[in-house]
Amino acid sequence: MHQGSPTQIAEAVSKGNADFAIATEALHLYDDLVMLPCYHWNRSIVVTPDHPLAAKQSVSIEELAQYPLVTYTFGFTGRSELDTAFNRAGLTPRIVFTATDADVIKTYVRLGLGVGVIASMAVDPVSDPDLVKLDADGVFSHSTTKIGFRRSTFLRSYMYDFIQRFAPHLTRDVVDAAVALRSNEDIEAMFKDIKLPQK
């Protein structure tokens, strides 16, 4: 198991140096990879309890634009969707710090360096009781995490098992049907009516 940027892990799989790439960004750049959608996720806004946004039920993109932001480095963990949301609103985010890891971002928020924008699943009420999590579903569109592997890969039983443990809807039959399709656009069409898990 190796962590890297989406481009690094997709490249590793494309070259045969890894079996799978699991990412939200950049996998579409590799036509030689079969990409299967695993789950949808969105972001949350995290602040300290004394922050002016902490008392709000929901936050608009206009309100968010008024504060310094701490979020993921571009190319990691759905960062492009954050940029798209601000561009769509005609706003420029004030990003003061970036990191590849949600725990680092939460530390910056705790230090008062900015408002955090991270994956919702990265905020845990047990380990993060000192942070206030605000829903950002109305601010950002969801992202989809995918698992990718080389189209030429002979999938062994343990590989099918790994895929299905990671994404239970990706049974052996579903994976085989997707692999038989000609392109990732066809795979996207195959999954358009399948309700993916939300994390």
Protein language model regions, located:
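A local structural motif
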Residues: M1, N87-V96
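Central regulatory/effector-binding core of bacterial HTH transcription factors
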Residues: M1-L29, T98-A99
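Short loop/turn segments at beta->alpha junctions
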Residues: S5, S60, T100-D101, A119
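Secondary-structure junction motif
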Residues: T24, A54, P68-A89, L155-Q164, ...
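Beta-alpha-beta core module
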Residues: Y30-N42, D103-S152, D161
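Flexible hinge/capping segments at coil-to-helix
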Residues: D32-R43, V47-L69
